[in-house]
């Protein structure tokens, strides 16, 4: 950059700082880059697939899927994990369907959970914005976008047409909320439902409710599906679940994680620790027996997981090693890609300069 441009840029930056305050514009290299803080989902496999160890704070996340696929269970699991670290959490129950007893079984401290059951979509989103602006709430769940009914629709007649009202409401609210979420470093999760588009010949006919605004504003979008049943004998005790990361602004997208959700218990975390421990060579498997550091911990996966439940310190130790191994490997791969891109950019610059 020549001297005239440098002086013009310095003058512009000085004027911006005087008018809007210090830090309104900054060079990326002036500050040391920091990792994005994350809140665990309760699923070890999903945390690793997300690339940063969980869902990013200060961002909007959308979780969508068919009915009974585990959307609310996953969000309650996020709340339980956040509360373990002293976080304040809120649940905006637009569907009026939150079961405190079930939430308690998943590990949620129901007594400390803030709950709102708003009458209209406007009220729900205004409450969400006020909680964010308080800078005192760490996690907010909105369940669900489909239940955010505009006031005009509630007060109107049953057969009245209200085209695009909900989409406009979501677009306006997200424009207003996004900046506040970043400043408050608050994680806001919107649960969404699936609808079918009529007349689609090619591609997926599935879409989510509430227009396109949430698709753009969300930093992470998770597609959760039930893929099968977990049985003990003939009794169904849970469901096999697959989560696909269809959008991720903080790490590479399109990864997926599979785990089990047990009815009345939540995500089968110890089962995930066993599976990932075996795949990473931290847990030895010989026939039906599982061993850790030479000590047998159980015959069969169920017994090994039961051992970890009875000895949480060992489970936490294995989980810590898995996280360090897989998350560091992912970070190293990303750093390698970034270095390669920087090197190629330098080569192009040198070529243009005639070196």
UniProtKB/Swiss-Prot annotation:
GO terms for MF: ATP binding; ATP hydrolysis activity; ATP-dependent DNA damage sensor activity; damaged DNA binding; single-stranded DNA binding
SUPFAM superfamilies tied to this protein: P-loop containing nucleoside triphosphate hydrolases (SSF52540), RecA protein, C-terminal domain (SSF54752)
Disulfide bond annotation, renumbered to this chain: none
UniProt keyword Isomerase present: no
Protein name (database record): Protein RecA
Binding site for ATP: 65-72
Taxonomic placement: Bacteria, Pseudomonadati, Pseudomonadota, Gammaproteobacteria, Pseudomonadales
UniProt main location, coarse: cytoplasm
Protein function: Can catalyze the hydrolysis of ATP in the presence of single-stranded DNA, the ATP-dependent uptake of single-stranded DNA by duplex DNA, and the ATP-dependent hybridization of homologous single-stranded DNAs. It interacts with LexA causing its activation and leading to its autocatalytic cleavage.
Pfam families recorded: RecA, RecA_C
Xref: CDD domains: RecA
Keywords: ATP-binding, Cytoplasm, DNA damage, DNA recombination, DNA repair, DNA-binding, Nucleotide-binding, SOS response
GO cellular component: cytosol
One of the GO BP terms on file: DNA recombination
Family: Belongs to the RecA family.
Annotated compartments: Cytoplasm
């Amino acid at each position: 950059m020549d001297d005239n441009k440098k002086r013009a840029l310095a003058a512009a930056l000085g004027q911006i700082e005087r008018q809007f305050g210090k830090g309104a514009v900054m060079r990326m290299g002036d500050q040391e880059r920091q990792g994005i803080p994350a809140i665990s989902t309760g699923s070890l496999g999903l945390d690793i697939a997300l690339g940063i160890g969980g869902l990013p704070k200060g961002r909007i996340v959308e979780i969508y899927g068919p009915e009974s696929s585990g959307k609310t269970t996953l969000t309650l699991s996020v709340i339980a994990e956040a509360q373990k670290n002293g976080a304040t959490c809120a649940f905006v129950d637009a569907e009026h369907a939150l079961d405190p007893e079930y939430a308690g079984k998943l590990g949620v401290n129901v007594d400390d959970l803030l709950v709102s059951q708003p009458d209209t979509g406007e009220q729900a989103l205004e409450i969400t914005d006020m909680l964010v602006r308080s800078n005192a709430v760490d996690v907010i769940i909105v369940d669900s976008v489909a239940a955010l009914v505009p006031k005009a629709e509630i007060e109107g007649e049953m057969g009245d047409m209200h085209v695009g009202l909900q989409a406009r409401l979501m677009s306006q609210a997200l424009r207003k909320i996004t900046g506040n979420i970043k400043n408050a470093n608050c994680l806001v999760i919107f649960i969404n439902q699936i609808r079918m588009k009529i007349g689609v010949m090619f591609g997926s006919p599935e879409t989510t409710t509430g227009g396109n605004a949430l698709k753009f504003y969300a930093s992470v979008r998770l597609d959760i599906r039930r893929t099968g049943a977990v049985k003990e004998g003939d009794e169904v005790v849970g469901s096999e679940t697959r989560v696909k990361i269809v959008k991720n602004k903080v790490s590479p997208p399109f990864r997926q994680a599979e785990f089990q959700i047990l009815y009345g218990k939540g995500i089968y975390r110890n089962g995930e620790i066993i599976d990932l421990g075996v795949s990473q060579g931290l847990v030895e498997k010989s026939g039906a027996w599982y061993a850790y550091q030479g000590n047998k911990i159980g015959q069969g996966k169920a017994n090994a997981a039961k051992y970890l439940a009875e000895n949480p310190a060992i489970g936490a130790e294995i989980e810590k090693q898995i996280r360090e191994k897989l998350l560091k490997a992912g970070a190293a791969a990303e750093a390698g890609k970034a270095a390669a891109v920087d090197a190629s950019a330098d080569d192009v610059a040198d070529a243009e300069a005639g070196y």
